[in-house]
């Protein structure tokens, strides 16, 4: 076989020409110490604040403290497999999670990984978790209602699409129940095809027991609400960094709907536990503690989260994200640090009281302390017309009831006020998982404020309401349809309603 020098030199020249000098450079560091969900890393000199890093066993972390000689990283997962000396890589990315309609009906963890055993998530894109809230110009004032299906809320503290309404109260006062009822009540609007009317639901569980989360998922499934809901769970047994991250993950999933001209409501249950998780992380990272040992930026923790709930203007798709954050108080102390912070950030609060709960007034809403800073602009015209007087009557009733305990000889007008107030209070009670449409609420509250209940004994008010609703549904469905379609209680509807109530009064005895 003949060897030609020219051919050999050509092969060598070709190889030299195609020789790549680019080496794969990735900046790495090594673990100095690890424990309690925090790792100290040596190296990674060019890492950026908030950047994701990856440990040698595949667990991800986020760089939060950039110090002169080391980097403080919070670990999104178990730290038991990580040991001193392990290699840590920069990823060059910021925490992102899957978003989109493919998440509806699913239960995911704080990083968006499915934990419900239903396989991988399809039809989803990825979006960054930490984004700036919309500015002032792209927003619009809140004007469409979120129908919670609870008379006490829809009549007295209405919530609008794009509002942030705090639900605050002690443990076991029914805070989560209010949120779950709101989800269940969206079944009717979500059954339609109009994306402008639908309201998708996101539930973020922070530091809850796993059994509690499983129970909530079961309740949503049994009531047919899971198909338009997403559950993000960072339970009590998960590391603090995941409990800190979960609300932002939920907000990112909600922003997908908001920015695409759709509507979503998100419940953070609860932000007290997120603040505790953040305090734990901050103290372990050796950040200086402030009041109640919370770090100085705990206000910013919640404000940047809740500012992402907004109503967008028509040029930006007219979508909305409504936030219902939950705060748990200790012995009714709303003047503690975290409750006052969140009250000042939100557009109103629904205040639930243990005393009312044990008296059997459920939902246990303290009507005097609960406010909505959006007010009647988030109500339908029909509800606005009937709910205006109920607020005043209940306020007068509370004032009088305090005095009436001392005096026995009350004049007729005071007695009438007390009788009416007792019946209205009874009327606002509602069992769990039985939300009402606004047209039914309108009729019931109209009956209460127009004196139809004055002759009914207090202990029969609930019975009166149930029978009235079945009477209206069976014999006056056209009236309910008229109120539902016009969203108003015009002269025609009012005349029909008065006639129906008069007819019902004769048969209810």
UniProtKB/Swiss-Prot annotation:
The reactions it catalyses are:
ATP + H2O + 4 H(+)(in) = ADP + phosphate + 5 H(+)(out)
Q: Where in the cell is it found?
A: Cell inner membrane
Annotated membrane topology: Peripheral membrane protein
Molecular functions per Gene Ontology: ADP binding; ATP binding; proton-transporting ATP synthase activity, rotational mechanism
Entry GO terms, CC: plasma membrane; proton-transporting ATP synthase complex
Looking up Pfam families in the UniProt record yields: ATP-synt_ab, ATP-synt_ab_C, ATP-synt_ab_N
Q: Does the keyword Ion transport apply?
A: yes
Q: What Gene3D superfamilies does UniProt report for this protein, alphabetically?
A: 2.40.30.20, ATP synthase alpha/beta chain, C-terminal domain (1.20.150.20), P-loop containing nucleotide triphosphate hydrolases (3.40.50.300)
The feature of type site (Required for activity) is located at 370
The EC number(s) this enzyme carries: 7.1.2.2
Kindly list any coiled-coil regions of this protein: none
What InterPro entries would the database entry show? ATP_synth_asu-like_sf (IPR023366), ATP_synth_asu_C (IPR000793), ATP_synth_asu_C_sf (IPR038376), ATP_synth_F1_a_nt-bd_dom (IPR033732), ATP_synth_F1_asu (IPR005294), ATPase_a/bsu_AS (IPR020003), ATPase_F1/V1/A1_a/bsu_N (IPR004100), ATPase_F1/V1/A1_a/bsu_N_sf (IPR036121)
Describe the task this protein carries out. Produces ATP from ADP in the presence of a proton gradient across the membrane. The alpha chain is a regulatory subunit.
Designated name of the protein: ATP synthase subunit alpha
Question: What is the originating organism of this protein?
Answer: Novosphingobium aromaticivorans (strain ATCC 700278 / DSM 12444 / CCUG 56034 / CIP 105152 / NBRC 16084 / F199)
What gene, per UniProt, encodes this protein?
A: atpA
